[in-house]
Amino acid sequence: YVSKYDPTKIVIKADGQALGKGVVLPRSPEGARETILDFMVRKSLREAGERVLIQKRLEGQEVSVIAFMSNQIGLLVPARDYKRAYDGDAGPNTGGMGGYAPNENLSRETLYRIHDVILRRTQFAMRSEGIPYRGVLYAGIMLTDEGPKVLEFNVRRGDPEAQLQLPRLITPLLPAMEATMRETLDPDMVRSDSR
């Protein structure tokens, strides 16, 4: 199946929890086949790789947008993490090699778009499906020429991102967490130093 696609135009993803190591950007048809064999037959990711997704590869800069989701949305300062090992992003994905915040590739206009178009709609859709989510939502976003695109959602903060974002909070963390759970969150309860 995977041989029908140009390997430089796809991403192969494990369909389970792979601790940041379940995404491969193949460079050749052989590399694509080996990735699928590695995940599904050799069980390199155990249960996480029993099923795989083959998706269109997006080009652009990645940004990690983490929010407290409740009755309102409280955004942490956006960050950028580096997942690939080795210089020049030449190696496999990892749980995170490092990162920085704030993410200077993200304009205020684009952040508003992510907030209003992606996060608010996700919040509305979850409530409409009877899944009113309260907690931390991690949105892995690719900033493409066509606008921001969601790569993934996680219901946790990323580790490199948390190390960058939590020290930048200028409001206390515990009241924001409690308000998130009680659905009394005010976005001003999650303010960060954006310098």
Where are the language model's segments positioned?
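ATP-dependent carboxylate/phosphate-activation module, predominantly the ATP-grasp catalytic core
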Residues: 67-69, 73-118, 154-169
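Phosphate-binding site of ATP-dependent enzymes
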Residues: 37-87, 132, 136-149, 188-195
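A conserved helix-loop-beta module that forms one wall/lid of the active-site cleft
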Residues: 1-23
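Catalytic core of tubulin tyrosine ligase-like
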Residues: 34, 145, 159
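Fold-independent oxyanion-binding glycine-rich loops
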Residues: 14-15, 21, 27-29, 56-57, ...
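Conserved ATP-binding module of the ATP-grasp superfamily
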Residues: 6, 10-12, 26-64, 118-129, ...
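Active-site "cap" helix and flanking loop/linker of ATP-utilizing ligase/carboxylase catalytic domains
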Residues: 115-137, 154-195
